[in-house]
């Protein structure tokens, strides 16, 4: 380090001297040298600053050729920081400059860097085929250029040998990612041979890379000794050349090698050495974090190994007992116990990759199944044995046992088993190089799965077929067709696939032994770990059903064995609902960004295709990034553990719509990091509206019977109005806004330049005011609606935006225009949900540059990335505002950690930024230091939201460290991040306790331990908290009670409290409502997802009827209240003057009969008045009542035949019409009585503005009756309904349901 410091000192001295002299070339050169020294130290952020100085000086003062080295340096540093989009910008510029200069040397370097970047993107995306294509393209180009330069060196000093060797390394690691291990081994060995032939130094870094990757290849081939030899050689070289990052990653690989062979102590020692090296480098937080996770994984594996040893002892005991039970009535029971024990051992051995043991246990299971005469268990055991041999890379034996399994399943008619076996055979054939045979097997498995109606196995087979066509055969058209099939199947099974959303920190089974760790995109259909549960569960079922037969001799089962498979449970039922990771795999990272690969490849499911087949330039493909949660669902196939979670947007990458109001697709933007803009098609710019004079022209994509023609003055405007219709009601205001925007766009230039937009006042059809869609829906496209303008309003920003669109030849975004039109304050720019991307937002940002003044900028729910933030930074710097507080809402976009770096580089924001919302962006722990800087320097920042940003304890701790007593922070949201430890949260709470103005805290989704709850209670006592969001925190009844007591232990402002999904019970609710302070201290209360039952409804009804109750919002969805509880709560509102919103969705369980609810209603809730002192309703003997059941298939209320049909109840609520009674002649009077009682209660709930009754099984007629009651309430004003299938929302005009996303609600 002494030499480094001396070099740094000399370089800085030379830089200062060159700057003072005005020698720009030397100034840039020395800035680059300083950056290079810092880069080699691992101080990438600091290096980036110096490389940018080099870049800025070169751009301003030097010829273009001087940009070559600085673009190369910037690209490399951004790559090391994993800012891939930024890296691609400079690397592509580097390549362009090199081509312009005809410089083959620089072209080769640029191609190598581009290949590395796309390769790293592929490793992290798991579904980005464009990246792997680009990686292949650039690596092959780099190798050709290196070979050309080697054969024809530019100078005698430069042979380009090093680059030629690196090219072998790069393509070798790429082949390893594609599961072509033999080809990869051949290339890497050839690289070492070239080193020896050309007498390259033994300590050359090129050799270290080759050794590194060869170590990985041999590890996948289970050639442990050779793997260790190459990994250790890699470490030795890196140590000699002082390449700490490479040395650390070498130790990571060595640790994984020890882990694979169950040498856990040695593994931890290696990981600890790697951790020490990573921590000694400045900007290697991600590497250190990864190593920490690996150490934790090894510790868990040690626990599993201990459990396995205990279970082995149990199996030995059971085996001894079997000797005694042989020939007795206990023989079968003893065999079943051994089978269950072996299932457990198979599961645990697969978790720690002990495949030899796994094979041993599987064979013992086969023997037990034979003795049990159970063909179902026998076929299962064949499947597990096949898996063992597959993981041991004995593919011929694996095929043999999978074939046996398939034949056995076929003999007993088990279609599911046949399908699973076929898909597994395909996996083995693919690994063995028989790609055509693999595809045939996948197709056969799919055919069987379709025949048996097994959606999950169909999905697995389709994904494997997609992989084969895309990766193996490069058949894009067929892959696209299969992708469409996959999407349709996933959409139809969306509820089942939700079970795949598991902890993000579990390690992927794809990083396993044998095929596990290979870059295979194939999905898995068969498994061992989950089979153990499935099989164990099936054994219990068999045992339960045949318990009386356990004493029969085993010979008797030879006759009955053919019927046993009928009791067999489907594997896939278990497979699709994994609860925890089945295999514990340390994650390996790429050894170095210098053309090296990760320690282990990943499997991928499938590739998202778009129509772009050009340069395969698909940074855009990242915008719908599908994040995978690694889970052991099926042990035999590797890729099926990667399940899909859509993290950032609701819109898939290949399914973006055009940004104007037309339904016509336009060109998808090129890239978020591109600096070249793609213009939209200029024809029909405004999509669904065309201006004409005297004659109507209809756009070719517009259907006559879906269009309406409007006349404004002498102009006719035709547009589709379906976007303004909800439940047969026309949203008149939305229609007026769209008409105003369209009319303005067709005005002459001189009028547009004034920025005056029309105010649409009246719309008339046939002389009548337009109020209902029914009034004219039959005349669409035939008659003209007259529109009158009541005045004009100035919209300067809108005018500027349209001008900037014209300058860039871009079509204005209609959604954005409407947002700007309805904005009441010019300084508040709200353009959320406008489908904006880094390119399409450019006209707006250019308009803001001219507009200058902005107090609030809301860009949420778009598709924006770091490129937008760079432009925003330039806007804020150039803005003349320095003192006005700024609200910056960027949530739910595609921003990364660099976004925060841009904020840190903008001094203006230090004095202005008051609110910063970044939730829903994948910031990762790379943002930690930037967040810390923002919190320390932004003096007026009072609200920070980093919810669901993929950050961990490391970042939370940095946030805590950055908070000082002088901080103005009042609101903090950190929920739904993982993993966050209790210590990190506790440290944060301690710091928050020191803040003078802190009042709002959101910890939703974080698991809170007892010490954290205690610390939180202390904060509640000492701070004036007004918002406390604790949903899904596992608080429990005791923790919640403790917290509420602390919260109201002193005079307290009204509080908004979220305790949803915290495991609260009805007793807890009783204690809550007994608290006087709670009655008048809570404004909003969310108890959704807690099983408070009918008893809890009683307590809450008493709370609502209390005159001191000040609740405005009450959420009770999924609280198991039953229909009786729903009715009781709504009845209680007749005595409540404050509640405005009530959510009672999902409270009628499908497993409970309507009769039980209605009986309860009949016994208590249909009484004329509800007393505060009423206790829990009496239990009703359902045997004495009718068998009235809820028909959940048709979502209607129907009553089955019953002996008690003679029971009738007189119709009540005379104020309502007889529609219910007349339509229910065929149904029980209980149903009609209940609906009329509920309608009557709704009619009495006068202050209520929003009511959610979704998913409670109400029939269509019942909903109409309920809405009639809602709309007939006195003083309610105009009402609104949102009814679709089982969605039932009643609201009023000023408080429409679903108008704002939950994440966008402002306090």
From Swiss-Prot:
UniProt keywords (A-Z) are: Chromatin regulator, Chromosome, DNA damage, DNA repair, Leucine-rich repeat, Nucleus, Repeat, TPR repeat
Effect on the protein of changing residue 166 to R: Abolished interaction with histone H3.1
Among InterPro entries, the record links this protein to: LRR_dom_sf (IPR032675), TONSOKU (IPR044227), TPR-like_helical_dom_sf (IPR011990), TPR_rpt (IPR019734)
Residue ranges annotated as compositionally biased, kind Polar residues, are: 587-597
Instruction: Show the segment(s) annotated as Disordered.
Output: 1-20, 573-603
Effect after changing residue 70 to R: Abolished interaction with histone H3.1
| Tagged with keyword Zinc-finger | no
- Identify a single GO molecular function assigned to this protein: histone binding
What PROSITE patterns does the database record attribute to this sequence?
Answer: TPR, TPR_REGION
Which parts are the LRR repeats? 302-325, 564-587, 739-767, 856-879, 995-1019, 1079-1102, 1245-1269
Q: Which cysteines are joined by disulfide bonds?
A: none
Q: Which parts of the chain are TPR repeats? A: 28-61, 68-101, 109-149, 165-198, 208-241, 248-281, 283-308, 379-412, 419-452, 907-940
Q: Which domain of life is it from?
A: Eukaryota
Q: Which Gene3D superfamilies match?
A: Ribonuclease Inhibitor, Tetratricopeptide repeat domain
Recorded hits in Pfam families, A to Z, give:
TPR_12, TPR_8
The record describes the protein's role as: Histone reader involved in homologous recombination-mediated repair of double-strand breaks (DSBs) at stalled or collapsed replication forks. Specifically recognizes and binds histone H3.1 lacking methylation at 'Lys-27' (H3K27me1).
**Protein name (Swiss-Prot/TrEMBL):** Protein TONSOKU
User: Which organism does this record belong to?
Assistant: Citrus unshiu
The coding gene here is TSK
């Amino acid at each position: 380090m002494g030499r480094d410091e001396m070099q740094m000192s000399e370089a800085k001295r030379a830089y200062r001297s060159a700057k003072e002299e005005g020698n720009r070339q030397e100034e840039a050169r020395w800035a680059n040298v300083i950056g290079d020294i810092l880069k080699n130290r691992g101080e990438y952020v600091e290096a980036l600053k110096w490389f940018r100085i080099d870049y800025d000086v070169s751009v301003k003062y030097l010829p273009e050729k001087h940009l070559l080295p600085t673009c190369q340096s910037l690209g490399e540093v951004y790559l090391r920081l994993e800012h891939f989009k930024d890296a691609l910008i400079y690397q592509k510029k580097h390549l362009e400059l090199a081509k312009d200069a005809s410089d083959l040397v620089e072209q080769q370097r640029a191609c190598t860097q581009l290949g590395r970047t796309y390769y790293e993107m592929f490793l992290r995306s798991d579904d980005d085929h464009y990246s792997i294509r680009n990686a292949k393209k650039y690596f092959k180009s780099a190798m050709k250029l290196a070979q050309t330069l080697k054969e024809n060196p530019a100078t005698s000093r430069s042979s380009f040998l090093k680059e030629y060797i690196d090219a072998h390394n790069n393509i070798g690691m790429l082949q390893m990612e594609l599961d072509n291990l033999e080809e990869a081994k051949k290339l890497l060995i050839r690289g070492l041979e070239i080193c020896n032939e050309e007498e390259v130094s033994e300590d050359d870094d090129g050799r270290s890379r080759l050794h590194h990757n060869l170590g990985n290849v041999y590890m996948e081939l289970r050639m442990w000794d050779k793997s260790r030899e190459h990994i250790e050689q890699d470490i030795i070289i890196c140590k000699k050349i002082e390449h700490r990052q490479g040395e650390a990653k070498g130790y990571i690989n060595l640790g994984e090698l020890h882990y694979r062979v169950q040498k856990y102590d040695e593994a931890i020692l290696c990981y600890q050495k790697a951790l020490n090296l990573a921590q000694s480098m400045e900007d290697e937080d991600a590497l250190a974090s990864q190593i920490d996770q690996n150490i934790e994984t090894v510790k868990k594996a040690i626990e599993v190994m201990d459990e396995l040893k205990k279970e082995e002892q149990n199996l030995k005991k059971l085996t001894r007992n079997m000797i005694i039970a042989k020939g007795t009535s206990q023989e079968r029971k003893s065999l079943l116990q051994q089978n269950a024990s072996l299932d457990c051992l198979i599961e645990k051995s697969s978790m720690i990759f002990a495949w030899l043991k796994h094979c041993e246990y599987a064979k013992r299971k086969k023997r037990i199944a034979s003795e049990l005469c159970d063909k179902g268990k026998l076929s299962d055991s064949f499947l597990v044995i096949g898996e063992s041999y597959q993981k041991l890379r004995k593919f011929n034996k694996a095929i043999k046992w999978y074939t046996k399994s398939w034949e056995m399943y076929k003999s007993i008619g088990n279609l599911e088993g046949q399908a699973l076996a076929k898909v597994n055979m395909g996996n083995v054939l693919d690994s063995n190089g028989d790609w055509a045979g693999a595809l045939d097997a996948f197709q056969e498995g799919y055919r069987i799965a379709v025949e048996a109606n097994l959606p999950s196995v169909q999905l697995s087979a389709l994904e494997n077929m997609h992989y084969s066509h895309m990766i193996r055969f490069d058949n894009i058209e067929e892959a696209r067709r299969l992708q469409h099939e996959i999407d349709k199947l996933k959409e139809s099974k969306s509820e089942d696939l939700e079970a795949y959303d598991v902890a993000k920190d579990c390690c992927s089974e794809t990083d396993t032994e044998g095929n596990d760790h290979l870059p295979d995109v194939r999905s898995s259909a068969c498994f061992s770990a989950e089979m153990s549960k499935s099989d164990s569960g099936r054994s219990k079922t068999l045992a339960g059903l045949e318990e009386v037969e356990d004493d029969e001799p085993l010979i008797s089962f030879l006759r009955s064995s053919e019927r046993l498979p009928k009791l067999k449970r489907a594997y896939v039922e278990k497979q699709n609902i994994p609860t925890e990771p089945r295999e514990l795999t340390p994650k390996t990272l790429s050894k170095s960004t210098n053309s090296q690969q990760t320690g282990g490849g990943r499997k991928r499911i499938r590739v998202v295709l778009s129509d772009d087949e050009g340069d395969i330039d698909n940074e855009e493909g990242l915008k719908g990034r599908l994040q995978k949660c690694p889970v052991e669902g099926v042990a035999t196939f590797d890729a099926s553990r990667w399940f899909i979670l859509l993290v950032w947007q609701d819109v898939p990458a290949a399914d973006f719509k055009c940004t104007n109001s037309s339904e016509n697709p336009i060109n998808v933007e090129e890239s978020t990091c591109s600096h070249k803009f793609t213009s939209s098609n200029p024809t029909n710019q405004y999509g669904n509206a065309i201006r004409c004079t005297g004659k109507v022209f209809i756009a070719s994509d517009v259907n006559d019977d879906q269009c309406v023609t409007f006349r404004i003055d002498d102009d006719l405007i035709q547009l589709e109005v379906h976007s303004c219709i909800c439940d047969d009601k026309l949203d008149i205001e939305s229609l007026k806004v769209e008409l105003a925007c369209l009319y303005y766009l067709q005005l002459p230039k001189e009028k547009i330049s004034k920025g005056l937009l029309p105010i649409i006042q009246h719309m008339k059809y046939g002389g009548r005011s337009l109020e209902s869609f029914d009034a004219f829906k039959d005349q669409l496209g035939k008659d003209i609606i007259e529109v009158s303008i009541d005045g004009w309003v100035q919209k300067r920003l809108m005018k500027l935006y349209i001008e900037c669109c014209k300058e860039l030849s871009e079509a204005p975004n209609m959604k954005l225009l409407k947002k700007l039109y309805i904005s009441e304050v010019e300084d508040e720019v709200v353009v959320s949900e406008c489908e904006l991307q880094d390119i399409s937002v450019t006209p707006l940002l250019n308009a803001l540059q001219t507009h200058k003044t902005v107090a609030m900028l809301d860009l949420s729910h778009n598709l924006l990335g770091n490129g937008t933030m760079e432009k925003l930074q330039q806007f804020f710097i150039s803005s003349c505002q320095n003192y006005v507080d700024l609200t910056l809402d960027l949530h739910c976009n595609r921003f990364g950690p660099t976004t925060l770096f841009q904020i840190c580089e903008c001094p203006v924001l230090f004095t202005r930024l008051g609110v910063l919302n970044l939730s829903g962006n994948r910031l990762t722990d790379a943002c930690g230091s930037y967040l810390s800087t923002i919190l320390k320097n932004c003096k007026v920042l009072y609200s920070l939201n980093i919810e669901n940003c993929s950050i961990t304890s490391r970042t939370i701790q940095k946030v805590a460290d950055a908070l000082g007593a002088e901080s103005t922070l009042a609101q903090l949201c950190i929920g739904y991040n993982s993993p966050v430890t209790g210590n990190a949260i506790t440290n944060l709470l301690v710091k928050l306790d020191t803040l003078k103005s802190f009042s709002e805290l959101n910890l939703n989704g974080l698991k809170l331990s007892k010490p954290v709850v205690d610390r939180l209670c202390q904060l509640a006592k000492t701070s004036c908290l007004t918002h406390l969001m604790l949903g899904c925190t596992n608080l429990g009844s005791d923790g919640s009670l403790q917290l509420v007591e602390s919260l109201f232990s002193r005079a307290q402002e009204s509080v908004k409290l979220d305790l949803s999904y915290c495991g609260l019970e009805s007793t807890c609710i009783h204690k809550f409502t007994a608290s006087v302070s709670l009655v008048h201290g809570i404004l909003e209360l969310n108890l959704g997802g807690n099983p408070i039952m009918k008893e809890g409804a009683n307590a809450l009804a008493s709370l609502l009827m209390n005159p001191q109750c000040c609740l405005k919002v009450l959420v009770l969805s999924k609280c198991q209240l039953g229909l009786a509880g729903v009715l009781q709560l709504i009845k209680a509102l007749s005595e409540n003057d404050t509640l405005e919103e009530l959510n009672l969705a999902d409270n009628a369980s499908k497993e409970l009969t309507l009769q039980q609810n209605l009986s309860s209603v009949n016994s208590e809730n249909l009484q004329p008045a509800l007393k505060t002192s009423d206790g829990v309703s009496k239990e009703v003997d359902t045997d004495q009542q009718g068998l009235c059941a809820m028909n959940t298939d048709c979502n209607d209320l129907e009553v089955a035949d019953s002996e008690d049909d003679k029971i009738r109840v007189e119709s009540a609520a005379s104020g309502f019409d007889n529609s219910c009674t007349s339509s229910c002649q065929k149904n029980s009077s209980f149903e009609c009585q209940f609906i009329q009682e509920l309608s009557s209660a709704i009619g009495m709930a006068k202050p209520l503005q929003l009511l959610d009754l979704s998913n409670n099984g109400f029939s269509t007629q019942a909903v109409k009756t309920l809405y009639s009651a809602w709309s007939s309430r006195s003083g309610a004003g105009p009402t609104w309904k949102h009814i679709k299938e089982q969605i039932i929302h009643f609201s009023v005009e000023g408080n429409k349901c679903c108008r704002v996303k939950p994440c966008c609600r402002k306090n």
